Amino acid sequence: MHIRILGSAAGGGFPQWNCNCRNCRGVRDGSVAAQPRTQSSIALSDDGERWILCNASPDIRAQIAAFPALQPARRPRDTAIGAIVLLDSQIDHTTGLLSLREGCPHEVWCTQMVHQDLSEGFPLFPMLSHWNGGLRHRPIALDGEPFAIPACPRLRFTAIPLRSSAPPYSPHRGDPHPGDNIGLFVEDLDSAGALFYAPGLGEVDEALLEWMRRADCLLVDGTLWRDDEMLVCEVGDKLGRQMGHLAQSGPGGMLEVLAKVPAARKVLIHINNTNPILDTASAERAELDASGIEVAWDGMHIQL
C-alpha cells in the first residue's frame, strides 16, 4: 500500500493567511524552524498508478501539482484519481471537490450523515450535478464490514465511527450522530500491511484502541498540543475537545493513547498552525521524537 501525504495541516493551512501567532509569524520571517503545510488530505494506492483521494482539501490543485503520479498525462484530459473518500463534511476536507469539477463524474464514498450535510448545509452534491454528472454517491456503511473500492481492488476499507463533531454549518452541530466522522482501517491484501487513519479524533475508547492496535501505521489527529491552545494563543475561544480534537498533551491525551499502541509507525497529521510541534527545535517536538512519534509533512510517502 502506498500512502502519500498531500497535505498535513489543519484548516487554514500553515501559515494561515490571517494568523500572526508565533508559528505563522516565524515561518514567514524564518525565525521558526518549520516548513509550510497545506490543508490535510492523503492519497492511497495498491499499485502506485491508480489512487484513492481521502478528503478533498481546498489546496487540492497545488497538491496534485506537487505529486506527478496524480497526473499521468495519458490523454488530453487525465487523472489518476479513481475515487474519493470523505471522512467527514468539514469545509477543509470537502471544498476541494469544487476544484475537481472539470473531472466529473467522480465516485464519492461517504456516510449518510456526510452526504446529508453535503446535500443540504453545504450542497456540493446538487451544485456539482451540473458538471457532467457531478458526484456519484457511494454509501459507506457503519456495520464494521470491510468494503472494496474498484479503483484499488487490493485494498480493503473498514469505516469506524468516531466521537467528534459535525462542522459548524451542520444542522446537527452539537448533536453528534454516528457517521458525522469516521476513521478508516485500510488493509492491503497482498502485503498484509494495515493503516489506521483518523485526522479528526475527539475521544479514544477501548473499542477504538483495538482497531489502532491492529495497524502497522497510525495516521491520527495532531491538531493541538494542549486543549486550551486556541485561547492561550489568543486566536480562538474554543477548547480542542469542543472542536472534536483530542490534544496531544495532558491526562488522557494523544501521547498517552499512542503509548498503548504497538504500531511500527505513529504519525500525527491535521496539525493546527498554533501547535508548537511544527517548530522542529521546540521542546514539544523533542518530546515526540523521544516517544517515536512522527509529524507528517506535505510530500511524505509511506509504504506498507
Swiss-Prot record:
The keyword Transport applies. Pathway: Cofactor biosynthesis; pyrroloquinoline quinone biosynthesis. Pfam families: Lactamase_B_2. Keywords: PQQ biosynthesis, Transport. SUPFAM superfamilies: Metallo-hydrolase/oxidoreductase. One of its GO terms (biological process) is pyrroloquinoline quinone biosynthetic process. CDD domains: PQQB-like_MBL-fold. It comes from the Bacteria. Belongs to the PqqB family. HAMAP family: PQQ_syn_PqqB. May be involved in the transport of PQQ or its precursor to the periplasm. This is Coenzyme PQQ synthesis protein B.
